[in-house]
Amino acid sequence: ACKFGLLLKLLEDEDVNTLSSFRPILPNMDNNIFYGNSLLGPNDVPVEFAEEINPFDFGERRFDLIVGNPPYMKTEDIKKFSPNEKKLYEKNNRYVSAHKQYDKYFLFVERAVNLLKKNGYLGYIIPSKFMKVGAASTLRKLITDNKLLKIITSFGAHQVFEGKSNYTCIMILQKNEHDQFKYSEVEDFAAWRIRTEGAYSFCNREASILSENTWVLYTDKHKHLLDKITRN
């Protein structure tokens, strides 16, 4: 489906007069698109579960850039969908982020970090709740202990995905230590989409303010409101 979608994109501007050259211009994508369970490798999965789980072998591949929108799936749904898969995520502390009532996207963040080259970048759009829920404490610890956080852009109450009710953010990590990170809040989503000036507010924050505990983030623009609430 992914390959077919990309090929359709290539044909967007074609018409009846150019379709005769359609076949030659289509690239062979067999060496560019792969599929499988990227959270588990062949050595992680018993032979009897291999067909069900379809582990993916990255081998020694490491990446300069990983970008994506990983699946959001609660622990209960992982167990319902594939109980054998859930057990393997939690086996022998394979994923430190497989903690309490974790969400599957926690694992994707951890996996991506481990697949980055030194100085490599990870950019994911994920639910903002990982900054607050107790189950994500081990994921927050992984990020903060290694000072990976570079940028977080919060969409607040703006709904990024049509027909879905998710409160999301874009998180950018770099496999290098950062003493500061940039935090921004989108105030006008429609304006932000076309990169209009003033669509968001931002500030730089010290990495030392973050730990495995709940992340309370705000821009300078909203600091006075938080101070007022705190005083009261």
What are the language-model segments listed below?
Residues 160-163:
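Short glycine/serine/proline-enriched coil/turn segments at secondary-structure junctions
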